[in-house]
Amino acid sequence: MKVTAELKKRIVALDRCYRSTWDTHTIGHVVRLSHTTVAKILREFRGPRPKRAKQPHTRRTKFLRRDVMWSSDFVRVGWGWLLLVTMDEHSGYILGWDLVRSEQAMAVVEHAESILARMGRAPLVWKYDHGSAFTSDVFQGLLDDCKIVPYPIAPHSPWVNGRKERDNQEVHNWLIPLEGLEVSREQLDREIDEGMLIRNFVKPRACLGFRKSAEVYFSEDAALDADDEVRGWFAQSLCDAKWELGAPNPDEVYEIKKSGERLHRKAVRLALQKEGLYEEWDVAAQEGLEDGPSEAEVVNRTSAENVSI
């Protein structure tokens, strides 16, 4: 079939009319042309299909002490297993990990209690996603008993948990040599234990000035004595921040309603900043001041900041 100028106009008109949501197969069916011919015509008159602009992640964060915030997450590692991991946000030190079959509340509680007992200390804030195991009454009760402020991230938003997500990818990369093999629970345990040992004690991390995670976590400079008095000061700072933000229940520190999570997260960050435990800034204002790519475009950053909150 000869492709006339009128037919080309019709193809372009269909594409514009339906805002480029019709693919070449659909348009080809309507005008009785092959999808490859339609694609060539659209490439000539329209160019690439319009794409939604992606908002760059330009906010950077930095925790100034250990045990300010811990974050927990489940990682699907394969062979029917999930890996439950908890990490210190300041140093990237992996505090604990457990293989589990499913996301169960009691598994999270046992995991958390084991870390708290072994480390002999607790964080000021505990970050987690909206999985039912973390939002369960038993885990929330544990946080309340230990006077740990909960920090649920926004639902379906893994990009706000950037440091933890990159750590999860490192776990997957470590297990690549096992793909396609039959692996027992004992073998998988050994492989993960070895990977975590290297991750904590052997690997120099660029974002830590090429120091090791364990070296940073256990250094005296990073120590935070989060005793009852410090927790009381932080709780008061959090209440003050919520009051300034106009939260309906500013006195809610350890129990938060789902409708108030967004204000709660902002108040936590403000309170941590006030106590000198956390910094955040936007690099967008700095773009154009230096030669080379902007920091927002650099994926493998080597400075001691992240976008994980």
Per-range role (PLM):
Residues 173-309:
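C-terminal domain-tail junction helix/linker
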Residues 11, 27, 38, 73, ...:
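Mobile genetic element proteins and their domesticated derivatives, centered on retroelements
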Residues 100-104:
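A short acidic/small-residue loop/turn micro-motif
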Residues 87-88, 158:
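Hydrophobic alpha-helical segments, especially N-terminal targeting/anchoring helices
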Residues 1-69, 157-158:
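Basic, flexible linker segments flanking DNA-binding modules
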Residues 36-87, 93, 105-114, 118-124, ...:
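Mobile-element integrase/transposase regions
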Residues 128-130, 134-145, 150-176, 184-193, ...:
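RNase H-like two-metal-ion nuclease catalytic core shared by retroviral integrases
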